A protein has these predicted regions:
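Hydrophobic face of amphipathic alpha-helices that form TPR/SEL1-like repeat modules
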Residues: 37-44, 55, 70-77, 104-113, ...
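N-terminal leader/linker segments that initiate helical-solenoid repeat arrays
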Residues: 17-55, 59-62
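Classical Sec-dependent N-terminal signal peptides that target proteins to the secretory pathway
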Residues: 1-21
Length: 319
């Protein structure tokens, strides 16, 4: 039974365009609307949303660009006002024209959500020209994926390198994957290792994971083990699964069923379908734990629910 999950390829698991709400609005310390800086992670009452909407609208009308960005988000999300995506984009366009990097970036995010890659690229380019690193990264991703522009790995790599040098670790990671295993790009394992390591050293878990898979491909199991351990500790599910498989198959370590069981269990708790399937196998046969067919069935059902067809087939024939 093959247990090792293969490298997470760029085409399947490229870090997505930056759409984190914490990036989509000004950070708290940049807000200049005294005592009225909303925390979008909190839920407010309808009356409070309406009150804040009125303040942001008035402030935006006198060109307080922070207020305009908040106002756009209120229109987009329907907070204190009827949803109006068109109005949100209009407000962001005006603020972006006033050289507000947050507005340009948020505008790009909104266009990207609408699948208008060409307009998203233009907005992100403006944000990048205003030295907003997340926008630069998104420009690189669009060149990488051919979004709104002809695919151009060379341009993507150039921008990834620039943002990586500014310690934006998503850029280091994506550039590493380009060098590691991307069709149409010359492989450079030495450079990929260096870039993965830089991001991993700053606890960028997926980078630790991919570096581990690279070492595993080269049968350097001891190095792979350490990196899977680190990524698993950072709650990267597939790393826990692969770490378990090293102990299960005695690759670079002594075979240890109890340790394998423990890491398959953690992988499953972190929603790794493969982890759940292997956990079920251990429960069913009593490997590294007490035999328990009910728990085996439960974990198989979870693996099936997480999309593993093989687990669904086993569940059907379980009894």
């Amino acid at each position: 039974m093959k247990k090792i999950i293969l490298l997470i390829f760029l085409t399947l698991n490229l870090i997505a365009l930056t759409t984190n709400p914490m990036i989509k609005i000004p950070q708290a310390n940049s807000c200049n609307i005294e005592d009225n800086c909303i925390d979008f992670s909190r839920k407010y009452s309808d009356d409070e949303y309406k009150r804040l909407f009125g303040i942001y609208k008035s402030e935006c009308e006198v060109k307080n660009l922070d207020a305009c960005i908040y106002l756009a988000e209120f229109y987009k999300s329907g907070l204190g006002v009827k949803k109006d995506a068109k109005k949100s984009i209009e407000i962001l366009n005006k603020a972006c024209d006033e050289s507000n990097k947050f507005a340009c970036h948020n505008l790009g995010v909104e266009y990207q959500e609408m699948k208008d890659h060409k307009m998203a690229l233009a907005a992100f380019k403006k944000g990048c020209d205003l030295a907003f690193i997340q926008s630069c990264f998104n420009v690189a991703v669009l060149y990488n994926n051919g979004g709104g522009v002809k695919r151009d790995y060379k341009k993507a790599a150039k921008i990834y390198k620039e943002v990586c040098e500014q310690n934006f670790y998503e850029g280091c990671y994506n550039l590493a994957v380009l060098y590691h295993n991307t069709p149409g790009v010359k492989r450079d394992y030495k450079e990929a290792i260096k870039l993965y390591k830089k991001a991993c050293d700053s606890d960028f878990s997926i980078s630790c994971y991919n570096l581990a898979t690279l070492y595993q491909e080269q049968k350097e199991y001891e190095k792979a083990n350490k990196l899977y351990f680190k990524a698993c500790k950072l709650d990267f599910a597939d790393a826990c699964n692969n770490l378990a498989s090293l102990y299960d198959d005695a690759l670079g370590v002594e075979k240890d069923d109890e340790v394998a069981f423990r890491y398959y269990n953690k992988a499953c708790r972190l929603d790794s379908a493969s982890g759940c399937k292997h956990l079920a196998y251990f429960y069913y046969h009593g490997i590294g734990t007490k035999k328990d067919k009910k728990l085996a069935e439960k974990e198989l059902k979870k693996a099936c629910k997480l999309g593993l067809k093989e687990a669904c087939e086993i569940v059907r024939d379980f009894h």
